[in-house]
């Protein structure tokens, strides 16, 4: 019995680490929703224990990152030539990375909605320098789902994606959920004719989602 409990904790710890590596920034509420079928007290205890041992970091109460170095601006310093520094470029990398972590956390709320409704497999990160607005992907009901985020004023980023896919043959069923700031963006986004848009969604600061079919 003791061996089984240790194994369960070990497996749960591995899953927590895996999610943090994939998403980058996950709240305690999100962990509890993800592990709704497990003992939630055990999840909370393990998170506390992993922070104490330094396996994960908790920069603010109830928010977890896989590595504290992401919060250190020195981690983003670029190689200097002849001793010169580009502080602006370094700070851009720092703020850009933290913004990307927040966007992936929003995308994880969307994934959790699908996990409740269907047998959605664990998400994978879409780490694309070319298309940084593409965040997470997962498989459910025989389809690949991709979660994108296009904020107000960033709509033109879709032009490159539309142009690239126009000359590619897209195989299989790909469905895309687009996170937006407000529903008024939808009409403007439609003109890019992005393949496979299955819906639009807003995500508030508390993780509440509101969907709109295309």
Segments and roles (model prediction):
Residues 36-40, 100, 104, 179:
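Generic detection of long, well-ordered alpha-helical segments
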Residues 89-172:
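Exposed, interaction-prone assembly regions rather than primary DNA-binding/catalytic cores
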Residues 68, 151, 213-214:
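Secondary-structure transition/turn motif
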Residues 1-86:
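Nuclease-adjacent, charged terminal/linker segments that flank catalytic cores
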Residues 63-64, 144, 208-209:
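Hydrophobic residues embedded in beta-strands of well-ordered beta-sheets
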Residues 157-214:
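C-terminal regulatory/effector modules of DNA-binding transcriptional regulators
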Residues 60, 139-142, 151-152, 180-186:
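Short, flexible beta-strand-to-coil junctions
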Residues 56, 123, 201-203:
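Assembly/interface hotspot detector across virion components, adhesins/toxins, and nucleic-acid enzymes
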